[in-house]
Amino acid sequence: MNIEFSNIEARVIGCLMEKELTTPDLYPLTLNSLTNACNQKSNRDPVMLLSEAEVLDAVDALIEKRLINDESGFHGRVTKYRHRFCNTEFGNFQFTGQEKGIICCMLLRGAQTPGELRTRSHRLCQFIDVKEVENVLDKLVQDSLVVKLPREAGKRDSRYMHQFSGEVDLAEVPLTVAPVSEVVQGDDRIEQLEKDLSALKNEVSELRYLIEQRL
């Protein structure tokens, strides 16, 4: 795979993919809207505080790589940007809706478990259950687009990470052994409440974004 995003480039592509799916009436995005999306506090890990200049530098680099289109010529005075990373006529990748949702979520939040991906991608795509997420992840792993990370000490599930920022060297993934007293058994009820809270926060953030763009 010839693609290797910087952290900011991954965030930019992830944001364009997300807004394409969640707010299609506001897509493609202006530089200001894209910067706001990159700096969102919800559904982002890590939270960034990028300037428009930093975002524009990443956009210019992605235009050079032919992964973003500058659509200023078609939308009047304001320059707007559209990704061509996947599912375009000349794109290298053609993903299913579920694959696209998972990749987008990983570009925005990094390594995650199948359960986290199911919860956090609910506005991007739909999964019946975690098993369906795992099946899609297995396909992406087979295509060398995603890698399964070693399970962390005290954790029930392994995380998965995209490889669009370079191949993940599993030998360099830190493994820590937690003391027995610190190993907490997963509580399904608490875990579900946490997932529901995360989903609500994402919806509030999207509503706030929509309101800001319409003012």
UniProtKB/Swiss-Prot annotation:
This is UPF0502 protein Ping_1905. Pfam families: DUF480. It comes from the Bacteria. Belongs to the UPF0502 family. It comes from Psychromonas ingrahamii (strain DSM 17664 / CCUG 51855 / 37). Coiled coil: none annotated. InterPro entries: DUF480, WH-like_DNA-bd_sf, WH_DNA-bd_sf.
